[in-house]
Amino acid sequence: MKGLMILVVFLTLVNIVYANNFLTIYNNNLALYRTNIELELQSGVQFYSIENIPTNIVTESVTFIPRNRNVQLFAQSFEYDLANTQRMMQRYIGQNIRLVTDQGQFTGKLIFNDGANYGLLNEATNELNIVSASKVNNVLLSEMPQDFFLRPTLRWQLSADRAGRYQAELSYLTRGIEWRATYNAILGNNDFTLNSWVTINNRSGKDFKDVNLKLIAGDVQTQVPTQRRMDMTERFSVQAATIPVFEERAFSDFRIYTLDQRADIDNNQEKQLRLYPLKNVRYTRRYEYIVGGNSVDVFINFRNSTANGLGVPLPSGNVNFYEIDESDNTPQFVGVARIGNTSLNQEVNLRIGSAFDVIAETIVANTSSQDRRRDTDYQINLTNNKAEAVEVEVIRSNRGTNVEILNPSISFDRRDASTFVFRVRVPAGGTQSITFRERVSW
């Protein structure tokens, strides 16, 4: 079918003037929208429709607050049975329609429409004409089917004491929109450059224009049912004269980030905004080997403090790590880690992968059991093929509660009742071994 023509007179919707729009987005696929509206009402009880509503609106969250007590809202419904060709044809079963084809026009009562053909009954001759949908250029309908809507619509039943314009506030929750933080860190010898972004994903079914934007970081409890590549530089495309900046502050038990400019968040858009300016953060690289494991893990450790070059609350998100390839001075990806919501002065420990040139193996030399105890002799061999010395934390953890380490070849720290940490320095291009006996009693 090449086209659909509807001969219909539309009812005028409520005259709404939007201003001062507020959008607060949460981490858990939820957002709160608030706006001021102006209604032009007649005296008495009436129906009015509010268009441009998200398809994912949480209908039970809609709040309507008139500025004048002379307006009262009695009932509302959310209309999402949107107009399209197939639904209209189903509504017109048993009614007269007109089909326009290259061979002429066909008029009659629509008996069926299966998508491939129209069945039209000529009531004067009682003939049934079957017209192929592929031959139809236009379908002419006498009017829009009742209770059909072009867009998702809130329909209100309300009353006003007198005709006139009334101010009100409208707010609601919607699903389908969320935000996340993403970080890019370029590692140097002792510090890294941290580039932080906010990514907003809008699948709510509505464009949010010129909104005052706030982001809430933290796990907000609700009863609602249930990455795109970043540039390594500070590139940012904005229409305003200045770069938008998020202002962060504590809010209840959460953190709130307020953008200092208004923003457009369009439907089916993934929008990225800078969270913080570039930060240079001091860090240490840590190597960890779990006794019995197959590899040595690499960790990036830093403290979220001002003295350390950071000192800002960090929303949870992925941290992409890069290192500079000195042969051509370009950043190369070396790993990704997940950071949780991180408060000020909190220690951060992120695993970015396994070391290639630092190798470890565990050898169980001897095991014996007697008198409600078991002794196991371990030898840990470490090899460092790097050009510089490294320190490896060798960790032995046992689920037993009565665990002892006997005859260790080097000193160790006891992290808890059953976890022991040996810090082993391995020379560049060299090897190092440690031995100890583990005794478990019961």
Residue map of PLM features:
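Long, intrinsically disordered, low-complexity accessory segments associated with secretion
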Residues: 3-4, 15-442
